[in-house]
């Protein structure tokens, strides 16, 4: 099974970088990165120390519903290139482990699919989840704070 790590869509990110409202209808906050743990969800790279970044509320689901978690994410304030077609875990996945959880075509959690997975086992876990017909896509989330990192899809 071939998988790919998927970043946020460029059209959504550009709107936010231009001051558009986040999931709560608020403009993104602008901060200066200290270079420690500021993962951009568009280029899937860490935001360098001294660079301006955005912090905002994001809902990585098409519609609000009980399982549509909304939470804080970081983006480069300046336009960056979207990471496309990555088959290996991106640079931003540099913690020891992450929550890896499957979602159905209805954008709801598939119960029993989630777990805290060592970073070096994320690809294998995603491939195993995709053997199930009820898994449409997978989220990678922070194991400490549940923050959305990226999506994994079948390639």
Model regions: which residues?
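Extended boundary segments
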Residues: 1-17
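Conserved mixed alpha/beta catalytic, RNA-binding, or beta-rich assembly cores of soluble enzyme
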Residues: 18-118
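Short, charged/polar low-complexity linear motifs in solvent-exposed/disordered segments
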Residues: 66, 72, 128-129, 155
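Functionally constrained cores in energy, signaling, and assembly domains
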Residues: 75, 126, 149
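Short, hydrophobic/π-rich interface segment
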Residues: 101-137, 141, 154
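Short Gly/Ser/Thr- and Asp/Glu-enriched loop/turn motifs at secondary-structure junctions
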Residues: 142-147
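C-terminal edge-of-domain segments
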Residues: 148-155
């Amino acid at each position: 099974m071939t998988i790919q790590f998927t970043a946020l869509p460029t059209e959504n990110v550009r709107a936010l970088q231009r001051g558009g409202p986040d999931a709560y209808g608020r403009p993104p906050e602008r901060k200066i990165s200290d270079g420690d743990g500021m993962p951009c969800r568009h280029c899937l790279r860490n935001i360098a120390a001294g660079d301006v970044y955005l912090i905002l509320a994001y809902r990585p689901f098409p519609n609000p519903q009980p399982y549509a978690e909304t939470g804080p994410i970081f983006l480069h304030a300046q336009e960056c290139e979207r990471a496309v077609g990555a088959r290996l875990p991106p640079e931003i996945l540099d913690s020891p482990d992450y929550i890896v959880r499957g979602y159905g075509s209805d954008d709801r959690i598939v119960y029993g699919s989630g777990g805290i997975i060592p970073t070096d086992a994320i690809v294998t876990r995603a491939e195993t989840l995709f053997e199930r017909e009820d898994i449409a896509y997978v989220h990678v989330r922070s194991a400490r704070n549940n923050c959305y990192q990226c999506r994994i899809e079948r390639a």
